[in-house]
Amino acid sequence: MVARAGGREAVTRFVRIAAWASAGDRVALLHVQPVTGRTHQIRVHLAYAHFPIVGDPVYGRRGDTSGLARQFLHAWRLTVRLPHAGERTFTAPLAADLVAYLETLGTPAARSPLLAEVM
């Protein structure tokens, strides 16, 4: 995907983990995998696809009312290749402020089995 003329190609894969619909607003928790590593790649691609990141002051919605003090971005699982240790995978549960935000949305209207892993 190239989001603007003259931009370099960047590839991002994303899958919906859960979705909420509250007060006319739609929110989705996504599993995102950047294939290329461009600056702001995830933020730009999700905004371009009409899924702006909650709390993003640049590419997000104006007048964000989430109450988050930061962007809803979380590195849940990272896999790296280390020269002497081979491939290693690290995971981290969703941060407490992000879990609290999701709880304010109520029960998801749709969810995948991956939701239990992420939370």
What are these regions (language model features)?
Residues M1-M119:
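RNA pseudouridine synthases
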